[in-house]
Amino acid sequence: MKQYTATANDDGVRLSRFVQSVTRDFPTSLLYKSFRNKRVKVNGKKAAPEYRLQAGDLIELYINDEFFPPEGAKPAPKAAPKRQPKQPKVTVIYEDENIAVLYKPTHLLCHSDRTGDANLVDAFTQYLAEKGEYDPHGENRFKPGICNRLDRGTEGLVIAAKSYAALRDMNEIIRNDLLKKEYYTITVGVPQSGRFTAWWEHVEKNNKVSIHAHQSQDERRKQIITDVDVLRTAGPFALCKIGLVTGRTHQIRAHLAYLGRPVLGDIKYGNRKMNERTGTKTQALCAVRISFLEISEESTLHYLSGKVIKLKDPQIVKQFDALDKNKAEPDKGASHAEN
């Protein structure tokens, strides 16, 4: 029999998931058989697989030792990339006991991928480990994670969670649309200010999205709504504030391209000639503001209600200031503002 005491990072974790995290090569069929046969108990009583743990719960597992790692053994590591990159120092914009809001620079991945390049999750984990807030070797049930991702070529604010409860509740906030994000972008051509609607469709073949004026007959497309506010203009360019009413993959980049005013530097959806003429090699898009609406009092993150977090002096404004107004003229494009 093995005993465990639920920690703060286990708070809210489904019991079946906890059991899977502390066992090794334990078949799912045996997992649920153990629950039926009362071989999994919490605080001395039979517990269901869907039970949500609370910090301090005593978990007793009457499971054969062969399904547990040897005493003192570290959790089996995930397959490591061929090279171990040096993780960058994280820039913290806001931090409390549950979350941190980080600045992600252009070209830094949010999550690890097969390239093995540095990424924000590992950099944040290293940051917490150095502060003594996380033990990567002693904790095998939770790893700090980020709650909203940005494309590799996009810079700006990213929310990171320090605990499972914070990650769970922040994801719930995002699902319930209680988190609003604003971006700055530089467009090729000056768009109209206003609210724009269209229909979004993902094209798996080339990992792009296509934007359309109407829903498809098979109703596979999803409606997108994007707010555009032109802040400044400089010849053929505009510095715009973008608000996302909906949040789809590549929504800002693809929607602005559909409107004929693509993001400067965007390789996938942008104006290649203008990118080359200006020497812009990455998309001019930055997440600059996060604001929270009213959050349920039951949430561990209720205290964030009404809070606004901003990126001060974003680099994209300096990039706009430096643009040469006379380098090129934009391609003509139609605008589809909603009246």
Identify the residue ranges that each predicted region occupies:
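RNA pseudouridine synthases
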Residues: 1-339
